């Protein structure tokens, strides 16, 4: 699956493991897990394949965040993303990563 990043800091975190913007500082364990989950998402052919990993807790969000999906980083953080299906088939899914959010805020 193809991954694009909506925010620059998300791409910086993935590429270099840190960000230049001090507003988005995370613990090293969170960053390592974030990179691991993004790599796992890239390896999968589509978002449906994420359901076989129970620890990710893949779900489509409801309410104010309807239209987004999420996977868990740990109990506190999740990656929120938009799914874009190209063509009639779900062959190529482009995930647009929108946020690394603190789940309970």
Residue ranges and their predicted role:
Residues 15, 46, 86:
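Residue-level marker of positions within ordered structural domains that often coincide
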């Amino acid at each position: 699956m193809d991954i694009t990043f909506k925010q620059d800091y998300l791409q910086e975190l993935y590429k270099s493991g840190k960000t230049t913007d001090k507003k988005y500082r995370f613990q090293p364990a969170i960053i390592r897990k974030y990179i691991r989950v993004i790599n796992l998402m890239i390896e999968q052919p589509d978002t449906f394949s994420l359901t076989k990993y129970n620890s990710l807790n893949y779900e489509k969000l409801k309410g104010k965040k309807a239209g987004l999906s999420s996977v868990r980083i740990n109990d506190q953080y999740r990656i929120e993303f938009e799914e874009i299906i190209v063509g009639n088939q779900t062959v190529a899914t482009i995930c647009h990563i929108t946020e690394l959010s603190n789940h309970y805020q």
